[in-house]
Amino acid sequence: MFIINLLLYIVPILLAVAFLTLVERKVLGYMQFRKGPNIVGPYGLLQPIADGIKLFTKEPLRPLTSSVSMFIIAPILALTLALTIWTPLPMPHTLIDLNLGLLFILSLSGLSVYSILWSGWASNSKYALIGALRAVAQTISYEVTLAIILLSIMLINGSFTLKNLLITQENMWLIVSTWPLAMMWYISTLAETNRAPFDLTEGESELVSGFNVEYAAGPFAMFFLAEYANIMAMNAMTAILFLGSSLNHNFSHLSTLSFMLKTLFLTFMFLWIRASYPRFRYDQLMYLLWKNFLPLTLALCLWFISIPIALSCIPPQI
């Protein structure tokens, strides 16, 4: 029974990820005054299936000088972590109900750094290694602000449990009272998932494709699926943290629909930002985090610690 539950959880995520690539190409196409994919199937709807078949039936090539085991393990690890992040998310029911759900997600997003580093190092290519080092530095840096923002949310919530966030936001979304945190969280998730305007890891003009430049066929598809699964997971997290369900829990179907619509809207914003903004310089990226976001998040964290204590309204410890 657990295997069936697992498949019912993983297959829709992979399908959503596949069609997200189509939505991205369509959105970017229309924003650049062109059609996007429109040949394979009606309105190009079968394009992701054609892409998947093409990638998984090709011969997986690897450089002669690469480290074989690490080269193969890296994409598998990336996809496994990207799918595991979804397990504690309440939609409104979870696959695994964890007391420390927020910490679990944070630690898994930290582990994804290893798959990037291994892929860059195992490829034995200078472009892949430079892309991997950039990605690791960027991901580790922005995890600092993500962790502090999560700590602030936990102080308001009174617990690390994700389901408790839905109860906290029954009357009012947290984005209303914590909009500076929400803004910094959203920008940090863009950097964490290596999306435009922070896609310095795969700068086409300098690094061709970044850390996965030597990958082809199935392993490349795994990295691709992992990247888009992470994007959707981060947007699902944003929806839970700041736009939590304000519906009655007796109507779980409506709650799920509301949650998915919020996630889709946030994902569409990712695509809109990609079409609108040019890439940051690397020094600007780091300056934004260490000089702007970090002091602000620390100050707001202190604010959320001191105000409940000063007003004697400490949140309930569940």
From Swiss-Prot:
Cell compartment(s), UniProt: Mitochondrion inner membrane
Record key words, sorted: Electron transport, Membrane, Mitochondrion, Mitochondrion inner membrane, NAD, Respiratory chain, Translocase, Transmembrane, Transmembrane helix, Transport, Ubiquinone
Superkingdom of the organism of origin: Eukaryota
Broadest EC class assigned to this enzyme: translocase
Regions that span the bilayer: 2-22, 70-90, 100-120, 136-156, 172-192, 223-243, 253-273, 294-314
Family: Belongs to the complex I subunit 1 family.
Function: Core subunit of the mitochondrial membrane respiratory chain NADH dehydrogenase (Complex I) which catalyzes electron transfer from NADH through the respiratory chain, using ubiquinone as an electron acceptor. Essential for the catalytic activity and assembly of complex I.
Protein name: NADH-ubiquinone oxidoreductase chain 1
Organism from which the protein derives: Osphranter rufus (Red kangaroo)
